[in-house]
């Protein structure tokens, strides 16, 4: 018997899946969350949810880097097919169009991605913070996006905004 439930991108676990997708988490993690949403398998409803977000969010991004979508589409097809499920035709079409289009050039615009970090509050408030990041490790950035303590600090600041009202934040640079 198939696992059936209503898919709502504003409620957990779908909300967690979409938040991870917007933050460009690894495909393995996204597949794991997608399976949680579907009760152990990636249902057609979850595939459609992922497809809609891939097309609407990443296709209209200010920094269109198709590599994350490409990797997710391939992993999604592989996972659904290996579990004996049915892959949506639209996902095959998306994957084939991404596979036949050339990779972005090495220009600076294509080497940037727009990650969106979501902070989810118990009162259903969601705060999304966009972060433009380089895909080139040699180009560098602050590193705060991958530093776990920065996430905890951000959550603390968002939980107690009065403590940080009219305060400034700066980065210490050692030379």
How should these model regions be labeled?
Residues 1-175:
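S-adenosylmethionine-dependent methyltransferases
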